[in-house]
Amino acid sequence: MTFPKSHLDLLEYTTRAYLFLATLMPDGSPQVTPVWFNTEDGLILINTNEGRVKDKNLKARPQVAMVIQDPSDPFRYIQIRGEVTEYTREKADAHINTLSLKYRGEPWSSQPDQRRIIFKIRPLHFDAH
């Protein structure tokens, strides 16, 4: 599934839009977190530390809902429903560094106790506003 052309600018590196990620807790209640993201080959990539709530939720229940909001107009956004297709530690440290450069303008400061992981999410439905 391809992103709506009207909202492709929200995916651009220079836009620095955040993605609000909704996952499901073990009891079925939602949990929402703002995250850094980028896209690759039509997939949405996020990065987290292993052991965090979203890491556990995504591994157990791969269905997600997301919103990417225009930083300059909060009423312009795209709602996405999708599912995790893959997660990997491979190149996760390099990926978080890329995201840190995008959002903070500086390299990521790795912590020795962190184990970064990339989640790849396939969009299944878009609703652009």
Question: Predicted segment positions?
Answer:
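Charged, gly/pro-rich active-site loop segments
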Residues: 1-5, 76-129
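Extreme N-terminal tail/first-helix region
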Residues: 1-19
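A generic structural signal for nonpolar/aromatic side chains embedded in well-ordered alpha-helices
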Residues: 11-14, 57-58, 99, 121
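Short beta-strand segments
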Residues: 16-50, 58, 64-68, 79
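Glycine-rich nucleotide phosphate-binding loop and flanking beta-alpha elements
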Residues: 27, 52, 125-127
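A short beta-turn/loop motif at secondary-structure boundaries
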Residues: 27-29, 70-74, 112-113
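Short, surface-exposed beta-strand-loop junctions and turns on beta-sheet-rich folds
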Residues: 52-54, 73
